[in-house]
Every structure is written in C-alpha cells, then in structure tokens.
C-alpha cells in the first residue's frame, strides 16, 4: 500500500492551521484604537467567552454521558448470529470530534472579538485597511475549521488503520476503522447543533429585545451605547454567526467526507493505493481545497473607497473554487484507476467522478447566486418588500413570507438536478463526492461568512464610540456586504447539508442492510410523515425560545431605562452584564429540548420499528428540513436588507423615505420577525437533518433486522414476496393471516420423509433480489442439479448446484455485466455455485414445521457457512406415480462476502420439487 498519500491528508490540515496562526498573530498586532473602544470590545469579548464557558459546562456532561453509551455499545460484538464491527474506541473518536468542534468555535470567537475593534480602528484610515483586517479575521475562522477537520479525520484514520491492523479495503478491520470514525462526525455534529441553536437563541433574544425597546420604543439608533442590550446584541453576532456557523460547517465538512469514505469502502478497485483511492479521494480533495482557499484570500482586496467590496469577495471565492476544480481533475485521474468502477451495481469511470465533483461545485455556486438574488439590497425581491412596507406592518410580513416561499423553487430544482446529475455521473458515490467537491473550499466560504459579523461588530463599536460619520460609513459598507455574504453562506450550508444527508442516507442503507424503502408499507409511510413534521416542531421550539428570551430582555431594558436615571442623557452607564446574563441563561436552557429531539428520535424509531421505518423518517426530515431552511433563511435575509435599505433612503411611489418614517417602522417589524427565521431556526435545519442522519448511521449496525417480517410470514419469508408456489399450486398472500392459513394447511413434518430425492430442475425455481440503490434488482438462476437425502442412521445430506451462466434479470446489458465481469460473478471462470448441508434442525421461531439447514455455500470459489431456512410441503405422486417432495424457503447472503461488488444483502427464495428414484 502506498501510504504517502495518507500522511499527506493531516499535513494539509496542519498547513491550514499554521497559516491560521500566522494570520491570527497579524490581527492581534493591529491597533485596537482608543481606550473607550477597547473597553466596549472588552465587554463583547467577555460576554462571548462567558457564553462559551456556560455552554461548555452543560455540553461536557452530555459528551461524557454519550461517550459512555458509545463505549458500551462498542463492547457488543455480536447480535444473534450476526457479527458486528464495533469497538469501544468510538467513544474516544466521539470525544475528539466534540472537542475539535468546540475548539473551532472558540478559535473563531476569539479572533472575531479581537478583529472587530481593530476593524473599527482601521476604518478610521481607509476602506481597504478595514476590509483587510475584518477579512483576515474571518480567514482565521475558515482555516481553523477546515484545518481541524482535515487534521482530525486524517490523523484518526491513520491511527485506526494501525490500531485495527487493516490490510485490505474490504476487510472487517476496515469496516471497524470507518465505523469508529463515524464517532468523530457524531461528536462534531452534536456540538454543532447545540452551538447553532444555543447561539441563535442568544443572538436573536438580544437583537429582538434591543430593537423593540431601543429603536421602536425609545427611538434611539441601532448599536447606541445607551441601549442596555446593545452589548448582548454584539456578543450575539459572535455567538451565532461566528461560533455557531463555524461549528455548523465543521460538522458538514466532516460528515461529507465521512459519508464518501463509507461508500468508498464498498468499492473494490485495483489502484496504486492498496484499493483505498475511493476512500482517500474526498480527504485529498478537501485538503487541497484548504491550499486553494489560502490562495483565494490573496485576491480579496480593494483599491479605494469607491471599490466594490462584494466583487472583491466574489473574486477570491471564484478563484479558490476554480483552482480546486482544476486540481481535482488531475487528482482524480492520478488516484483512480482506468476502466469501470462499480458501487451497488452502478458502473462509472473516473471521468464520471470528476463530473460529479464539477456538478457539486456548480450546485454550490448556483445556490449562493440565487440566495444573493433573493436577499441582496437593490434586487427585485427585497424591493418588493420595501414597496409593501408603505402600506403597513402586515403587508411587509406578507411580502417577506411570499419572497421566502418563492425562494425555494430554484434552489430545490438545482438540488434535484445536482442529485440526478451527480448520480448519473458516478452513482451514489457521485452524490457523495459532489458534496465533498462543494465543501472543498469551506475555508474560503467560512472566511467570507465570518467577515460579516466582524464588520457588524465594528460598526456597532463605531456607533457606541461616537466616531466620525465617515468611519460608520465604511463599516456600514462592509456590514451591508456582510449581510449578503451571511445569507449566501446559509444557502451554501443548506445545499451542502442536503447532499451530505443524502450521502449519509446511502451509507446508512448499506450498513443497515435495507433492500428498499417501501412507502407502500404503513409503518414506513407513518415514519415519512413524522419525519416531515419534525422540522416544524423543531423550528417552533427555536422561535418560541427566542420569543420567551426576548420578553425577558425587553423587561430588563425597560427596567433599566426606568430605574437608572441619566441613561438617555449619557450621564449613566447601563448594566450591560445583566442583559448578557439573560441571553446566556435563556440560550442554555432553551437549546436542550430541540437538541434532544434531534438526537433521541432516530434512536427511538430505529430500535422500536427498525431501519426501514427509520429510513422513511430520515427522508421526511431531509425534504421538509431543506425546504424550511431555505424558506426561513431567505425570508429573514430579505426582511433584514429591506430594513437596511431605508438607511440610505428608498423611493416608494415617487417619494423618498428614510429611517424613522412609517414604512421604515413597518420594515423594522419585518426584520424583527425575520431575525429568528434567518439566525436561529433556519440555519439549524441543516444541522438537524445531518445530525439525525449521522445518529442513524452510528446505530445502523445494531438495528439490522428489527421490524423485519421474516419470522411471521413463513411461506413468503419477506412481505415483499407475495406469491408462493406450493406443489405446483400458486397462491397470493394478501395478508399474514392468509399466508399462515395456506401454509398451515400444507406444511408437513420432515420426519416422514426418508431416502433419496433428486431435485427436478425443470419444476424448481430460484429467484434473487439484490439491493440496488433504492429499488431492488431481481432475477433468477437455474437450479442445475441436486438431491435431498434423509436417513436417521447416517444423517441428512442436501446438495444443490446452480448454473451461474443462466443469470437473468430481464436486462441483457446488465446480465452480461453480472455474468462476465470479474467484480461480479465471473462465470467464465466460475460456472457453478453449490450449497451443501449435513445438518437439519427445527426452527421453532419460524413455526412448528420450519427448518434450518446449516451448510456451506460456494460462489466464485469462496466458501461461507450459511443458514438456509425452509418448509417441507409434503409428498404427492405425479401422473407417472413417482413420489414428489416439495420445499420452499430462503437464505440471505452478503454480496461482499463472495467478492461480488453489487449491492449489500442478496435475498434468495426458492421452490423445489424433488423426485424419489424408482429404483
């Protein structure tokens, strides 16, 4: 195995962290301004750190408890007859993921609270310098998140390869290594959920409280130093849009790579990396994305005061994306082998893999462009809300809701096209690698996102410090661009979450051994509906939490205005710390229930109703959550920029309107309603769908078979099989009762059967069903020969031989691939498959006359012990008075156990007639 490429991955992460440290040191060296500016920045920094400490105190208890459960689950190595690839080390992986996610948030928070006041001071000199400081602060956040993710994943993967002595890609040891690695993603996503929800509640409780009393009731400007909630509001920008967004994208980044690795482990290729290229490819591409994100930052600069800041950010973003795509082309061609690659029956080439990466990049770009259109100032959607503000508060709300709902159309169509395009390029691996391609430049995306709240804080400090108007004009310029980048960042995050969740879903289906998600089944359909409901109740709880916390904030601000004389005259200083404490306590208290729903629901559904119903739940959550996330984020962003448009003046029906006008007051109401939409519940949707998917992936090995109807439907064995052939008579089982009544009338005790019976291939049949994405591939194979010999003295003997050259799935091209290709059945070399058994016993769990034959199945020269379940249907003379015995049954085999790179579990059903020789 060429191990050099494996060690390159964490090294790329370390490179990102080194550049992050250099840029962080540069930010710290910049001038922090006058004493009063430093004092205000100190309040913000102290409030932000107080929140993090309070949050970590609570989450540390959760992490210890969850790690203990995971450690216990890792000691379970067998359920029934099924071996598990588990290890207690998953608990360590979980803790590291949680710590790295928290550390990513801390790094971002720390540098943001340093960069804000330094951006304010830089704005006293020029727009160019202010952009440089604020964007460098954002870059520290971006590189910290991406560097920690790549370093953590790459480093742990190397450790686990050594720990579990992995020598083959398709080995049980590799399965264990990757399943343990899922703990890292679970830890990251768990912390991300609480950081995003808690941070969102914090920031919007402070924002809404500050706006309602400060701007609406007291009539003072935004970020006015006299407003007791203004420090909490500025702290909230860091808590929600820096730490929350950082943890969010850290989780997406890790989950995307991990989902691709899980699917890559199912692929068997002959390459120069020991068959590991499909597993390593997403890590290498994302690692190179860090390098090109660093290069992209060099292009983010402006020449003078009239330069367009948005264009500068876009140039850096497009450069990093373009360079990453170009590099991906060469990396894919270098790492992946020539010829066809197969995953679950879908064949593709390395050209298709690159095509999928390109599709993912294009989808991410389109999502950002569309989000910018619906939320940016000067665009038609925002202008429509401005116009509707002229007729009152209600029409402003109606306009914003309409814009948010319409904004789902193009993104959903884009996502649908991206899913289909990437799937056609490279199957489910293509969908996963498309998400990885989209996330590759996360460092740059997050740098642009984090720049926004830094600029917002800088403007707040300028306002509170009463700096000259030109300073506030420069910070407002940056802030306006920051609002748009924050909105586009949320669109990007939702798009990545959608593709990531689909990739995680595909990985879950493979590990859980599900053939298909059949929504015709009542439990699955029920799960689908419940899943669709969860984002609504989750959003309701988040918005309700903001409302409750905002009420407490409003009461506190009113109390201070009432009880502290001289605040409005600048003679007394407000008690900022009390408002900070209200937001902190409320966010910690209120985040627990939504977080609990996301974590516990998949566990309850999976362990009670099984993986198929859980699959239905995940499908409902994903579709509903993506729609809710896009709608709420875009509606909130549009309301926000509609309000901000009044600062420079807007033209409504030929008349100019400014701040404090009636239309402006209506826009403030809309912005207040939109705040929890765009900064709390909306952004939380993408973590919700990812976290529920990753929890399902982690528990998948433990819920295999739960909810299965194998034991209750004896003749059909699986409820998907609705027809039985018993002694030449075909029956249709429309219900369990009907099925049982038929079988009870025909089942016999095999003890009555003695002697030799030769299998009659002409009157016997064998069908198979192999999972193929969501829909099964069904086919048949001819039973070539065989016999059943029963003798009390010598013991039973069963032998069956299959003619593998007769594989038939009603598709000539697919049949040719299945028969001829080495990664499938390779019938030119292995023409026959056999089953031999010398032990038959009753299986009381399946019924009084149900039996299990324990024997050896040989396919492609590979021998595995299997259990064949069957019912003896009795004997009956044919027209020539030859005694005929009948058998029906099934067995299940894992395709990979026999070197077949198609699907997961193959279900085999058979009906056999065997004739007793006449002499």
Where are these regions (language model features)?
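Intrinsically disordered, low-complexity regions
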Residues: 75, 81, 155, 237, ...
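Low-complexity, acidic/polar, glycine-enriched regions of mature
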Residues: 741-919
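Intrinsic disorder/low-complexity detector
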Residues: 451, 485, 688, 712, ...
